[in-house]
């Protein structure tokens, strides 16, 4: 009995597989075959534009074709090549992006790991407003639960605010992929969070949420009065994800850690001119936050942390102060601390401003570079009321210069630390220019 129904069953399964084929990746063999065909194919083998699919007939259901812009004069294929596979007519409703109705079939876009913003009309020429195209692309990325890709070397002009649910999608660029806001959004440029509230399913958050993207706002003298990237919110499990190779500049607040943001890693990233801020009295926030190989610099910018434990490894802070409030604790290790090179006389690198906050600076280097003005502030500060936790400094090399002399003010000769809070210092290596600077 089973043998008699086997051919029928196979035909049924084959038909079902064809209907759903557009939602899945090509097999490796098919991808390789298509790649080889692209190398040797003449322009007649390709649909020149997406619109050509409307009149194109398939030779058989399951046929894979390439759609590209073919430059006859240069006799080359442009890089933006897409693959489409033919599906049975009426197998799925066309949407003119992923599924396009052809002459005798539905042409379904073949994608194995991401969606491309250019499929949705984004240009990336640094002039055209791509907001609507990227909004549509982001909606589809959430719908299909696939990453969204911004091609290399493109600058997308946008405005308004976007949201990224890491339980469903992520954003990734290539070399020098830029998102430039033409005007300040009302609250934030991008909010990153997770809608996955079931604790046993938070493993879906354990991913790279953002990578290889630059978020541009205003200039150094006209920062946008908004948040560039907001992390967390009312959702309970906005955690466990990472940001890598992110560049943020031109915003009053470059990063904002909201409620329910914890165990987030940020690496190989650059933050210029604006603040890094954690929400005061945040709930369920601040557990094991980690910066690795990041740079925070310029414009007297600050990081202001109010709760949680914050780890900095191999980071640089140049003309930037890490301010510790509430019960927050900071661990700065294997880093680089450097004063500003501008005409000013103030430089504090790490300051502790409450009785329950703490910080440690270990295995790091402090460089007091020459500036036109005499720097008169201590590099570290501990509030008077902090008598039990305070600041711990160990294995710090300090390259002192003649333009640094806190004794010229009411610091009264204190070399490294201001305030009367608790300080423990071990293994300080100082390249002394003038020994009178040491208290």
How would you name each of these model-derived features?
Residues 2-20:
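N-terminal secretory signal peptides and thylakoid transit peptides that target proteins
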Residues 40-60, 119-150:
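Acidic Gly/Asp/Thr-rich repetitive segments characteristic of extracellular carbohydrate-active
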Residues 45-51, 67-82, 142-170, 174-186, ...:
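N-terminal extracellular ligand-recognition/capping segment immediately after the signal peptide
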Residues 64-114:
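Short, surface-exposed terminal/edge motifs of secreted or surface/virion proteins that either
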Residues 110-133, 169-225:
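Right-handed parallel beta-helix/beta-spiral solenoid domain characteristic of secreted/periplasmic
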Residues 146, 159-161, 175, 181-187, ...:
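Short glycine/acidic-rich loop motifs that flank beta-strands on beta-rich extracellular proteins
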Residues 170-174, 205-210, 240-244, 263-267, ...:
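All-beta strand scaffolds that present successive hydrophobic residues in beta-strands
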Residues 203-205, 211-295:
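Right-handed parallel beta-helix
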């Amino acid at each position: 009995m089973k043998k008699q129904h086997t051919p029928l069953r196979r035909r049924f399964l084959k038909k079902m597989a064809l209907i759903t084929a557009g939602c899945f990746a090509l097999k490796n063999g098919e991808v390789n075959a298509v790649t080889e065909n692209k190398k040797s194919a003449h322009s007649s083998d390709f649909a020149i534009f997406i619109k050509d699919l409307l009149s194109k007939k398939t030779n058989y259901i399951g046929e894979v074709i390439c759609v590209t812009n073919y430059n006859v004069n240069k006799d080359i294929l442009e890089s933006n090549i897409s693959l489409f596979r033919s599906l049975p007519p009426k197998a799925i409703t066309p949407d003119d992006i992923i599924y396009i109705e052809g002459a005798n079939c539905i042409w379904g876009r073949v994608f194995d790991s991401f969606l491309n913003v250019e499929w949705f009309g984004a240009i990336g020429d640094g002039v055209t407003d791509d907001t609507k195209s990227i909004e549509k692309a982001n909606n589809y990325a959430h719908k299909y639960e696939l990453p969204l890709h911004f091609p290399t070397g493109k600058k997308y002009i946008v405005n308004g605010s976007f949201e990224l649910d890491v339980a469903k999608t992520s954003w990734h660029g290539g070399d020098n992929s830029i998102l430039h806001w033409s005007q300040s959004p009302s609250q934030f440029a991008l909010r990153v969070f997770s809608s996955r509230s079931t604790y046993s399913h938070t493993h879906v958050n354990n991913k790279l949420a953002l990578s290889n993207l630059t978020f541009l706002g205003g200039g150094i003298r006209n920062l946008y009065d908004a948040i560039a990237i907001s992390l967390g919110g009312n959702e309970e499990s906005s955690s466990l994800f990472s940001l890598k190779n992110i560049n943020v500049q031109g915003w009053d607040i470059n990063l904002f850690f909201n409620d329910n943001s914890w165990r987030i890693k940020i690496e190989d990233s650059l933050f210029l001119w604006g603040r890094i801020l954690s929400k005061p009295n945040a709930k369920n926030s601040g557990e094991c936050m980690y910066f690795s190989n990041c740079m925070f610099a310029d414009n007297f910018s600050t990081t202001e942390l109010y709760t949680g434990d914050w780890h900095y490894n191999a980071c640089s802070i140049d003309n930037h102060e890490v301010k510790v409030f509430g019960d927050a604790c900071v661990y700065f290790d294997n880093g680089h601390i450097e004063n500003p090179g501008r005409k000013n006389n103030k430089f504090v690198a790490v300051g502790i401003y409450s009785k329950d906050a703490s910080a440690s600076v270990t295995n790091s280097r402090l460089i007091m570079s020459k500036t036109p003005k005499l720097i008169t502030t201590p590099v570290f500060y501990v509030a008077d009321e902090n008598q039990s936790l305070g600041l711990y400094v160990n294995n710090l090399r300090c390259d002192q210069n003649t333009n640094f002399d806190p004794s010229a003010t009411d610091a009264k000769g204190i070399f490294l630390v201001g305030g009367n809070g608790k300080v423990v210092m071990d293994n300080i290596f100082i390249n002394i220019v003038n020994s009178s600077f040491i208290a």
